[in-house]
From Swiss-Prot:
Gene3D superfamilies: YdfO-like. This is Uncharacterized protein YdfO. To E.coli YbcV and YcgX. Signal peptide: none annotated. InterPro entries: DUF1398, YdfO-like_sf. It comes from Escherichia coli (strain K12). Transmembrane segments: none annotated. It comes from the Bacteria.
Length: 136
């Protein structure tokens, strides 16, 4: 099966069922080093351990990302996603309101980094022992 199809299935599944332990174990199994998730377009740039890349194109469900920065909203939204109080799409919209343009999830470091349009780091969190979705 084509890598794009495999990764699309993995990302679609975690967006729906929010099973993060399964999600991260699948990414490790497929030798993912890290991935970059672009909030506005839902494009995902996956980097494998051998430095090959895979691009997953979003579904054209565009959201506007604010220029204002709100670290508290990021943390609150992330916690709500982990506790399944909100859906992944609500998570995505709230992060866009908080000024998140993209996030980078490093599988080896078990960290997620949230960045703004100007590439400044807004927030960092651990992805260990979480039950969160597409990158917390």
């Amino acid at each position: 099966m084509d890598q794009v199809v495999i990764f699309k299935q993995i990302f679609d599944k975690v967006r729906n069922d929010l099973n993060y332990q399964w999600f991260y174990s699948e990414l490790k199994r497929h030798n993912v080093s890290h991935y970059i998730y672009y909030l506005a377009t839902e494009n995902v740039h996956i980097v494998l351990k051998n430095d090959n890349t895979v691009l997953l194109k979003g579904l054209k469900n565009i959201v506007s990302v604010k220029f204002s920065k709100d670290r508290h909203l990021i943390e609150t939204t992330s916690n709500k996603l982990k506790s399944r109080e909100i859906t992944f799409q609500e998570y995505r919209r709230n992060l866009a309101k908080a000024g998140v343009f993209r996030w980078v999830t490093n599988i080896h470091e078990q960290k997620r980094y949230y960045y703004t349009f100007d590439n400044s780091l807004l927030f960092t969190e651990s992805i260990q022992k979480t039950t969160q979705i597409l990158p917390r």
